[in-house]
Amino acid sequence: PVTLAIMLLSSVIAGTLAAKLKMHARLSAQLAFRTQILFDTHRLLQKARSQKEILEITCTQLARLFDRSIVAYAAVNGRLAEGHLFSEKEKAEDQSYLTLDEQQIARWVYTNKKRAGATTHYYKNSKCLYLAIRIGDQVYGVIGVPAQKDVLDSFEYSILLSVLNECALAMDNARNAEEKEKNAVIAKNEQLR
């Protein structure tokens, strides 16, 4: 009887330790995957030249990172362009994120420079959480993250904000480079006169 109790106790302890080890291995793999995506995002954004390319890279990486579709609206000439859906799968299937109501919420975010949509006080019945891609008062676009069964936890939300800030910085740098190039062409034309 004593041997049986000791064997039972040791098997319970070994099973518990094995389960904890398996959980830690899974969490470590998930953290490594997220870190790799963030590193790839940074590297790809450094290479990108146009604002459109920067937005596509950002949305594709966010879709991979969160394993859900991402809605993006680029700011063009002071207005939001038509939305695009970037899916974590090969083909984006759900167009319900691009309805007129959802576009109105994205425009509100663009105008007010505040987050809105699901999980917020503004437009809480929306299908997505909308955030502005911005630096200061300059807004470069709006990103929508669908609020599925599971909402973003605080860690995922902080990663989302970090990626959006990096996207905004890359877009700001691209805009500055375009303006510098235009000014150089104007100066060269003035010299030739």
Predicted region positions:
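Hydrophobic alpha-helical transmembrane segments
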Residues: 4-8, 54
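Signal-transmission/dimerization alpha-helices at domain junctions
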Residues: 7-20, 159-183
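Short hydrophobic/aromatic-rich motifs at helix boundaries and adjacent loops
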Residues: 10, 27-32, 101-102, 169
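Short amphipathic alpha-helical coupling elements at transmembrane boundaries
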Residues: 23-36, 40-43, 60
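Conserved HAMP-HisKA connector
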Residues: 34-38, 47, 181-193
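GAF sensory domains
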Residues: 40-173
